[in-house]
Regions:
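"A position-specific structural signal for the A-helix of alpha-solenoid helical repeats
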Residues: 22, 62, 69, 103, ...
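Sequence context surrounding c-type heme c attachment/ligation sites in exported
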Residues: 14, 18-21, 25, 179-200, ...
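Short coil/turn linking the two alpha-helices of tandem helical-hairpin repeats
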Residues: 24, 28-36, 64, 69-75, ...
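N-terminal leader/linker segments that initiate helical-solenoid repeat arrays
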Residues: 10-51, 57-65
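Flexible helix-coil transition and linker loops at the boundaries of alpha-helical arrays
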Residues: 47-60, 88-100, 128-140, 171-184, ...
Length: 270
C-alpha cells in the first residue's frame, strides 16, 4: 500500500513538473519574441518544475537557455553562472547532448574573463568536442559562430573554427529554405551575420551582397512578425549603406531575439 501511494505521488509530481516546464517554456518563447518582462515568470515556472523533477532534461535545457539569455542580454554574471550549473547538470544526465556541451563550453569561455586560462581551455575543448561529434548540428554551429565573434582571431582555432565566415555560410545554407513560425527571421538574420563577418574580413562587396540577400527574404504574414522584420531590415539597411555600427551593437542582434522577434514594442529599455 505504501509503495502504491509513493508511486502515485511520484507520478503526480512528474506530471506537475512537465506542466510547469511547458508553462515556463511557453513564457520563454514570448520572451524571445520580445516580451522581456515575462522572463522572471518563465524562469520561476521552470525552477518550480526542476524542484519537482530535477532530472527532466527538456526543462533543464530550456531553463539553462533562459539563464543564458538573461546573462547575455542584461549583463548578469549570476545568470551566466546559473546557466553553466544547469547545463553541467544536464550533461551529467545526458552526456550525448552536444548542443548543451557547446553552450556549456561557450559559458566557460565567457566566465574565464580572459584571465582564467584553465577555464577558457576547458570551454574551448568542449566547444571543439561538440563540433567534432556533430558537425552538422545547427545549434552547435550557431553557438560556435557567436562565440568566435567574441574571441581574438588567434584563439578561434582552439574552439575548432578556422574559418568563421565559412561556418556562418554553412549555417546560412541550412537556413535558406528553413520555415518556422517560432523563428521566422532565421534566414534574414543569418545572411545579415554573414554580411557582418565579411565586413570584418574586409570584403565589402560580398558583404553588401549578403546584406541584400537578407533583405530579399520574403516578408512574414503575421503582424507581430512583420513589425519585428521591419526593425531588422532597418538595422541591416543602415549597415549596408555605410553605417559605422556593426549589427551586433543593436540589442535585437546582440542576443537571441533576432530570429524570433515578433513583439519589438515590448523590449525593455537598455
Amino acid at each position: 500500500m505504501v509503495t502504491l501511494i509513493l508511486i502515485l505521488f511520484l507520478t503526480a509530481a512528474a506530471s506537475d513538473a512537465k506542466e510547469l516546464a511547458q508553462k515556463g517554456y511557453t513564457a520563454f518563447k514570448e520572451v524571445l519574441a520580445g516580451d522581456e518582462a515575462q522572463l522572471p515568470d518563465a524562469i520561476h515556472y521552470m525552477e518550480q518544475a526542476r524542484s519537482l523533477d530535477e532530472k527532466y532534461v527538456p526543462n533543464l535545457y530550456n531553463l539553462a537557455r533562459a539563464y543564458f539569455f538573461e546573462g547575455a542580454t542584461f549583463n548578469k554574471l549570476e545568470s551566466i553562472m546559473n546557466a553553466e550549473k544547469v547545463f553541467a547538470r544536464m550533461l551529467e544526465l545526458d552526456p550525448s547532448r552536444t548542443d548543451a556541451l557547446a553552450f556549456h563550453g561557450s559559458l566557460l569561455t565567457i566566465m574565464s574573463g580572459g584571465k582564467d586560462m584553465a577555464m577558457f581551455m576547458r570551454g574551448a575543448e568542449e566547444l571543439k568536442t561538440a563540433f567534432q561529434r556533430t558537425p552538422d548540428d545547427a545549434t552547435v554551429r550557431i553557438v560556435l559562430g557567436f562565440t568566435s565573434f567574441n574571441l581574438p582571431p588567434q584563439a578561434r582555432a582552439m574552439i575548432g573554427i578556422n574559418d568563421p565566415v565559412g561556418n556562418l555560410k554553412y549555417i546560412g545554407n541550412r537556413l535558406d529554405n528553413f520555415e518556422s513560425d517560432f523563428a521566422p527571421h532565421a534566414s534574414v538574420v543569418m545572411n545579415a551575420i554573414i554580411g557582418e563577418g565579411l565586413m570584418a574580413a574586409g570584403d565589402k562587396e560580398k558583404a553588401r551582397a549578403s546584406f541584400e540577400k537578407a533583405l530579399k527574404v520574403p516578408q512574414p504574414l503575421d503582424d507581430g512578425q512583420i513589425a519585428g522584420r521591419k526593425v531588422l531590415d532597418e538595422i541591416i539597411r543602415t549597415r549596408m549603406n555605410g553605417g559605422s555600427k556593426p549589427i551586433f551593437a543593436e540589442p535585437v542582434f546582440s542576443t537571441c531575439h533576432s530570429c524570433h522577434l515578433a513583439a519589438p514594442d515590448k523590449l525593455l529599455p537598455r
